[in-house]
């Protein structure tokens, strides 16, 4: 198959990199570099826009960045884009315990990609959101908070799924499909 485009995905997370490569398949050559980008406090959109702008300035060319979040309905969307910091502090079990006393364990998992052709160029955002439940940690395949998020309509957490299963239904998959469609339309 012909490669449509080479994309520099700026991330230090090897698991996210592997997921994106698996989801986008062989139509795109995904290259990677881990730059130390600012992680501002703000909405997911603000975080991704700032990361994409900073990465484009460093690279002086096209870049892709990503931010994920996990929001608990009982906590009005927290921890949201700060889930990484909560996870580093309390781990998956602590993330579950944060919501365990509430009646509802409903949550949303979200992923937002930011893509730009370079410094000063428009930044395009692609978001995927998936409804699910926060459950006690289960499974060992995956990373981050995968062991506590069970998508609605599924009997397994992300960490209990194979990479192929997770990458065919995840919040990252939904966002990556929008990104793929955009990139393919740009080539036509």
UniProtKB/Swiss-Prot annotation:
<dbReference type="GO" id="GO:1990748">
    <property type="term" value="P:cellular detoxification"/>
</dbReference>
<keyword id="KW-0539">Nucleus</keyword>
<keyword id="KW-0547">Nucleotide-binding</keyword>
<dbReference type="GO" id="GO:0036222">
    <property type="term" value="F:XTP diphosphatase activity"/>
</dbReference>
<dbReference type="GO" id="GO:0005737">
    <property type="term" value="C:cytoplasm"/>
</dbReference>
<dbReference type="GO" id="GO:0009117">
    <property type="term" value="P:nucleotide metabolic process"/>
</dbReference>
<dbReference type="GO" id="GO:0009143">
    <property type="term" value="P:nucleoside triphosphate catabolic process"/>
</dbReference>
<keyword id="KW-0963">Cytoplasm</keyword>
<feature type="binding site">
    <location>
        <position position="51"/>
    </location>
    <ligand>
        <name>ITP</name>
    </ligand>
</feature>
<feature type="binding site">
    <location>
        <position position="84"/>
    </location>
    <ligand>
        <name>ITP</name>
    </ligand>
</feature>
<dbReference type="GO" id="GO:0036220">
    <property type="term" value="F:ITP diphosphatase activity"/>
</dbReference>
<dbReference type="InterPro" id="IPR002637">
    <property type="entry name" value="RdgB/HAM1"/>
</dbReference>
<dbReference type="GO" id="GO:0005829">
    <property type="term" value="C:cytosol"/>
</dbReference>
<dbReference type="GO" id="GO:0009204">
    <property type="term" value="P:deoxyribonucleoside triphosphate catabolic process"/>
</dbReference>
<keyword id="KW-0479">Metal-binding</keyword>
<keyword id="KW-0460">Magnesium</keyword>
<keyword id="KW-0464">Manganese</keyword>
<dbReference type="GO" id="GO:0035870">
    <property type="term" value="F:dITP diphosphatase activity"/>
</dbReference>
<dbReference type="Pfam" id="PF01725">
    <property type="entry name" value="Ham1p_like"/>
</dbReference>
<dbReference type="GO" id="GO:0006974">
    <property type="term" value="P:DNA damage response"/>
</dbReference>
<comment type="function">
    <text>Pyrophosphatase that hydrolyzes non-canonical purine nucleotides such as inosine triphosphate (ITP), deoxyinosine triphosphate (dITP) or xanthosine 5'-triphosphate (XTP) to their respective monophosphate derivatives. The enzyme does not distinguish between the deoxy- and ribose forms. Probably excludes non-canonical purines from RNA and DNA precursor pools, thus preventing their incorporation into RNA and DNA and avoiding chromosomal lesions.</text>
</comment>
<keyword id="KW-0546">Nucleotide metabolism</keyword>
<dbReference type="GO" id="GO:0046872">
    <property type="term" value="F:metal ion binding"/>
</dbReference>
<keyword id="KW-0378">Hydrolase</keyword>
<comment type="subunit">
    <text>Homodimer.</text>
</comment>
<feature type="binding site">
    <location>
        <begin position="67"/>
        <end position="68"/>
    </location>
    <ligand>
        <name>ITP</name>
    </ligand>
</feature>
<feature type="binding site">
    <location>
        <position position="39"/>
    </location>
    <ligand>
        <name>Mg(2+)</name>
    </ligand>
</feature>
<protein>
    <recommendedName>
        <fullName>Inosine triphosphate pyrophosphatase</fullName>
        <ecNumber>3.6.1.66</ecNumber>
    </recommendedName>
</protein>
<dbReference type="InterPro" id="IPR027502">
    <property type="entry name" value="ITPase"/>
</dbReference>
<feature type="binding site">
    <location>
        <begin position="11"/>
        <end position="16"/>
    </location>
    <ligand>
        <name>ITP</name>
    </ligand>
</feature>
<feature type="binding site">
    <location>
        <begin position="143"/>
        <end position="146"/>
    </location>
    <ligand>
        <name>ITP</name>
    </ligand>
</feature>
<comment type="similarity">
    <text>Belongs to the HAM1 NTPase family.</text>
</comment>
<dbReference type="GO" id="GO:0005634">
    <property type="term" value="C:nucleus"/>
</dbReference>
<feature type="binding site">
    <location>
        <begin position="171"/>
        <end position="172"/>
    </location>
    <ligand>
        <name>ITP</name>
    </ligand>
</feature>
<dbReference type="GO" id="GO:0000166">
    <property type="term" value="F:nucleotide binding"/>
</dbReference>
<dbReference type="InterPro" id="IPR029001">
    <property type="entry name" value="ITPase-like_fam"/>
</dbReference>
<dbReference type="GO" id="GO:0047429">
    <property type="term" value="F:nucleoside triphosphate diphosphatase activity"/>
</dbReference>
């Amino acid at each position: 198959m012909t490669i449509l485009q080479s994309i520099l995905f700026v991330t230090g997370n090897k698991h996210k990199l592997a997921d994106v490569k698996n989801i986008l398949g062989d139509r795109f050559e995904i290259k990677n570099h881990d730059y130390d980008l600012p992680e501002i406090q703000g909405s997911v959109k603000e975080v991704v826009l700032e990361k994409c702008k900073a990465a484009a300035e460093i690279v002086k060319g096209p870049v892709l960045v990503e931010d994920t979040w996990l929001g608990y309905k009982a906590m009005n969307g927290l921890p949201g884009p700060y889930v990484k910091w909560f996870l580093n502090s309390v781990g998956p079990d602590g993330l579950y315990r944060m919501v365990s006393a509430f009646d509802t364990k409903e949550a949303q998992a979200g992923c937002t990609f930011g893509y730009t052709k370079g410094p000063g160029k428009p930044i395009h955002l692609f978001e995927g959101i998936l409804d699910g439940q926060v459950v006690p940690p289960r499974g060992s395949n995956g990373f981050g908070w995968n062991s506590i998020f069970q998508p609605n309509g599924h009997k397994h957490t992300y960490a209990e799924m194979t990479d192929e299963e997770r990458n065919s239904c995840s919040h990252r998959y939904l966002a990556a499909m929008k990104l793929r469609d955009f990139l393919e339309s740009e080539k036509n």
